[in-house]
Structures are given as structure tokens and as C-alpha cells.
């Protein structure tokens, strides 16, 4: 019997990740609760199914999930119709969702109690990284589970890190995304200041890319249009990684900081800025659109 992979959650990130697995010649079926996402996946030549019951069959050796929040992961794995009691003991569970550490550990421990290997493996790199299979993947779980998952993770990503025990992958991702949110705000402030000073934005951008002010939002994912082709800022801020998702991750970071009495003043400030931005109806825009708030009266790049 041919062993297959089950992929749950084929949204903006999950779909291109699943595509890369398919292109690598793996037997793959996908499912999403959204009919729109399923139709989109079908148009990408992915084999879709209409339910979890149809997805989790005896030939499934690996399950990959890419879901929005911890409550979704918990429902898929541990809910009334959860898959944790449907997969075989030889199955490997890979949760690529970015969720709270507590939920990640809870799901993983239940899997281990049943003799099933599981890792948390959140990703970084946005939609472009998912499409190009250049994602950074941060893994929490046993060394044995990490080694078993590595060949498959390498199909989806470029840099694969074993961060530590269960939950460590999400912990590392939350720390990374807190820094990313802060950096995007800093990049927006710097470029909009240059605009107010009437300095050529393209020249300032080139200078910053090659100077000590460089960062990922500057060199790869700039918040203003006309700087790097293919970025959301050049596509009316159509999301690669939405402001709503960044806001969620900053909330996770803030909750983590509180739980261990860590001081994260910039992280807290970034959360306040993104939270207000989302409340104003911008949650579905790319997170780089935060530059609209930073720009004030200097902003002349309208978004719908």
C-alpha cells in the first residue's frame, strides 16, 4: 500500500506548502473547512477531500496541519472528531501552525501518550517563502521525531532548526515574530521620515539595505511600494502575512512575556499599534501596510 500525506489547512501559506510536497512526487491529499480554499487548492491540481474522515485513512503516514490559531489545532487534533484517535501509531504529526505554547504542548503530550510522534513546526518566510520552498522552520519535539520529519520539512523549507522539546518551535517562532513586528514598524518609521524630509525613498532604501539600518523588512519585504518587485506593498497590500496574523502573534508574545515575567516594552508597543490598526478594519491587509499609520499626512499610497 502506498503511504500518503494528509495536509489540513490550505490557505495562503498551506496551499503552496502542499504544492511543493506534491511537486516532490509525494502522495498527498488535502482538506480545509473553507470551500473557497478547497476550490483554490483543486485549481492548483491538489487532490482534495470533503471531510477529515475521508482524509485520515489507513495509508496516511504523516499529517501536516497549518491552521490559524490554537483553538483550531486543538479542535482538529483533540476535538470530538479529532484525528489523534484516528491515526495509526506509526503516523507522524506535524503542526506547522503558530499557536500558544501551552496548547502545542497539550496536543503533543496527548499524542505521546498514545505512542504517536509529534512535532510543532511553525514556519517563517511568508507566502513568497512558502511558494519558493525557502521557509525557515522551527521545530519542537524529540530528536527522533525531528529526524523522521526532516526530509519532508526540507521539501517545504530551506533552513530547518531543532529548537528543543515540544513547544520550543512555537516559542522560537513567537520570539522571531515579535522582532519582525517591531522591525516592520521601525522600517516604516524610517522610510516615512525620509519621505517627510523630501529625500528620494529609493535612494534611502538602497542606503539602508547596505548600511547598519538593514533588516528583513528593508531588504526583502519593504513597507512602501516601488522598492522591490513582487512584494505585497506593490500589490495594494494583498496579504502574504496579514496584519491580523501579526497582531495574533504579538498577542502570543505578550502573553508569553507575562507568563515568565519578561520585560518586552517594544513588543508591547508593537502590539498596541497593530491592534489599533486591525480595529480600524485593516486586519486583512498585509502587515507591511502598517506604514499607512506611521505615514500620517505624508502617506500618498492609498489602499482600498
Language-model features, listed with the residues they occupy:
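Rossmann-fold NAD(P) dinucleotide-binding segment
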Residues: 52-117
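Rossmann-fold dinucleotide-binding core
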Residues: 8-10, 76, 99-177
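Helical "substrate-binding/catalytic lid" subdomain
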Residues: 169-269, 273-297, 301
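Methionine-biased hydrophobic packing positions in alpha-helices, especially
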Residues: 13, 17, 37, 66, ...
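NAD(P)+-binding Rossmann beta1-loop-alpha1 motif at the extreme N-terminus of oxidoreductases
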Residues: 1-58, 62-66, 91, 127, ...
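Hydrophobic beta-strand scaffold residues
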Residues: 28, 48, 118-119, 160, ...
Amino acid at each position: 500500500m502506498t503511504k500518503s500525506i494528509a495536509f489540513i489547512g490550505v490557505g495562503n501559506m498551506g496551499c503552496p506548502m502542499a504544492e511543493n510536497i506534491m511537486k516532490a512526487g509525494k502522495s498527498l491529499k488535502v482538506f480545509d473547512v473553507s470551500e473557497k480554499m478547497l476550490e483554490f487548492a483543486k485549481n492548483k491540481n491538489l487532490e482534495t477531500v470533503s471531510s477529515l474522515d475521508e482524509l485520515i485513512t489507513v495509508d496516511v503516514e504523516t499529517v501536516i496541519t497549518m491552521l490559524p490559531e490554537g483553538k483550531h489545532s486543538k479542535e482538529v487534533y483533540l476535538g470530538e472528531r479529532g484525528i489523534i484517535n484516528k491515526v495509526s501509531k506509526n503516523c507522524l504529526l506535524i503542526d506547522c501552525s503558530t499557536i500558544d505554547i501551552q496548547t502545542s504542548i497539550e496536543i503533543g503530550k496527548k499524542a505521546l501518550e498514545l505512542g504517536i510522534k509529534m512535532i510543532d513546526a511553525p514556519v517563517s518566510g511568508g507566502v513568497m517563502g512558502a511558494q519558493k520552498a525557502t521557509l525557515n522552520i522551527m521545530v519542537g519535539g524529540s530528536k527522533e521525531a525531528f529526524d523522521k520529519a526532516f526530509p519532508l520539512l526540507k521539501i517545504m523549507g530551506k533552513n530547518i532548526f531543532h529548537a528543543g522539546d515540544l513547544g520550543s518551535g512555537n516559542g522560537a517562532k513567537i520570539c522571531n515574530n515579535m522582532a519582525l513586528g517591531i522591525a516592520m514598524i521601525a522600517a516604516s518609521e524610517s522610510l516615512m521620515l525620509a519621505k517627510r524630509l523630501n529625500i528620494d525613498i529609493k535612494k534611502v532604501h538602497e542606503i539602508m539595505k547596505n548600511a547598519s539600518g538593514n533588516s528583513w523588512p528593508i531588504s526583502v519585504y519593504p513597507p512602501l511600494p516601488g522598492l522591490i518587485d513582487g512584494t505585497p506593498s506593490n500589490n495594494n497590500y494583498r496579504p502574504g502575512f496579514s496584519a491580523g496574523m501579526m497582531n495574533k502573534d504579538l498577542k502570543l508574545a505578550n502573553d508569553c512575556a507575562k507568563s515568565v515575567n519578561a520585560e518586552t516594552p517594544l513588543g508591547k508597543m508593537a502590539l498596541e499599534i497593530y491592534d489599533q490598526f486591525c480595529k480600524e478594519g485593516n486586519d486583512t491587509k498585509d502587515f507591511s501596510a502598517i506604514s499607512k499609520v506611521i505615514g500620517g499626512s505624508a502617506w500618498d499610497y492609498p489602499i482600498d
